């Protein structure tokens, strides 16, 4: 084990089990499920689903500690170490799809530089299917045994990358930040040309995890109708795991064209990844699927509101971008907020929707407000999202020009 280590930022639960066990998340491909291996102890993040909902009530399980920290290689050593024949375990900070796509792209660059390194990820959780696109990468979606941990010479906490602490208020590009930190050249990109023809497969993914980044239903309906009128096969993919999905689907109305279908969502992230890989063109909100297009260089249009398209797309030019141009008395797009925030007296929103300065919105909401979320995505969107709807004609014109469509 190398010297000059320090504790990981996040704490892990250290537990033992007298009985064999296996565990897999419902939205992850079954083949990535994990099983015990008779190790004396195991480790999982203290805030993971496994720790919070399973271990505390499981027979034969003993929690040894909830304050365990791995000894990890410090950030200032990442670019100096030689990983040529090393075994490296990367701790994944969270399972947000966009961030994990960036980390997957970084791992491609890492293995391009160190093809004989043995690599693994821990805490990939719901994003495990994304990491599974890398051949021979070991994936520990929720826990690792002491036996497996002992195989790794280096443990690296990726939350030490620049900008991670502030990612909730100012998005970063993990691929760019990590390649710079490890002094790696990113993998070359293959260009996929846009070629419209009847029968083309077009995927539209309008929903993000936040109302700040979800596209107006009326805009999505207009885009879908445009493509359908030119004999494209259009699939609108919603997210059944989000509480606002039914309301959003109702707001789309009756898209009667036979070549438009609406999918409530996919069972696993692996199914979503496969869907993106098979599309000829995509229209996406600032969401995980927008980032997944980078893995296949799928061409399309990314429509952005609160986050910067330039920051999120980085070097990837497969998506043409449209950025909300909203300017108001308290903010202008892109403001950098990834999620709704709360005022000290509990009002939930953003600077534009609440007409307050950014300094007033210092906290994330302590509890969800489903009714507010439904209103924001269907009836009264935040100003930067509403501006996208107001510019629908210009967005349609851009699509017509790029895909050489007549009116």
Predicted regions and their residues:
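Catalytic machinery of carbohydrate-active enzymes
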Residues: 2-407
């Amino acid at each position: 084990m190398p010297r000059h280590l320090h504790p990981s930022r996040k704490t892990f639960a250290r537990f033992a089990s007298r009985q064999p066990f296996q565990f897999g998340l419902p939205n992850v491909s079954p083949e990535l499920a994990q099983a015990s291996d008779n190790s004396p102890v195991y480790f999982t993040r203290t805030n993971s689903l496994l720790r919070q909902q399973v271990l505390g009530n499981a027979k034969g399980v003993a929690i040894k500690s909830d304050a365990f920290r791995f000894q990890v290689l410090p950030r200032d050593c990442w670019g100096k170490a030689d990983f040529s024949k090393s075994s490296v375990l990367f701790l994944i900070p969270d399972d947000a799809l966009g961030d994990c796509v960036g980390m997957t792209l970084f791992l491609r660059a890492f293995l391009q530089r160190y093809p004989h390194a043995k690599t693994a990820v821990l805490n990939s959780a719901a994003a495990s299917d994304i990491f599974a696109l890398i051949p021979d990468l070991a994936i520990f979606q929720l826990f690792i045994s002491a036996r497996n941990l002992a195989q790794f010479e280096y443990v690296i906490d990726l939350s030490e990358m620049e900008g991670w602490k502030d990612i909730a208020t100012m998005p970063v590009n993990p691929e760019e930040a990590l390649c710079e930190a490890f002094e790696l050249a990113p993998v070359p990109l293959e260009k996929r040309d846009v070629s419209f023809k009847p029968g083309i497969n077009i995927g539209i993914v309008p929903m993000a995890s936040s109302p700040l980044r979800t596209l107006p239903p009326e805009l999505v309906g207009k885009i879908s109708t445009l493509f359908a009128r030119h004999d494209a096969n259009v699939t609108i993919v919603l997210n059944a795991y989000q509480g606002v999905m039914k309301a959003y689907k109702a707001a789309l109305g009756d898209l009667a064209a036979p070549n438009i279908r609406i999918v409530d969502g996919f069972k696993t992230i692996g199914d979503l990844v496969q869907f993106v890989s098979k599309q000829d063109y995509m229209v996406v909100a600032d969401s995980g699927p927008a980032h997944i297009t980078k893995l296949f260089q799928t061409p399309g249009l990314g429509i952005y509101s609160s986050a910067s398209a330039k920051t999120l797309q980085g070097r990837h030019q497969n998506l043409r971008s449209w950025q909300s141009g909203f300017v108001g008395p308290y903010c202008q797009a892109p403001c950098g907020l990834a999620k709704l925030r709360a005022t000290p007296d509990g009002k939930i929103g953003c600077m534009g929707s609440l007409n307050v300065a950014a300094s007033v919105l210092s906290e994330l909401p302590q509890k969800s407000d489903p009714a507010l979320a439904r209103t924001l995505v269907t009836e009264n969107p935040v100003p930067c999202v509403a501006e996208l709807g107001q510019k629908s004609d210009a967005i349609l014109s851009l699509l017509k020009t790029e895909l050489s469509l007549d009116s």
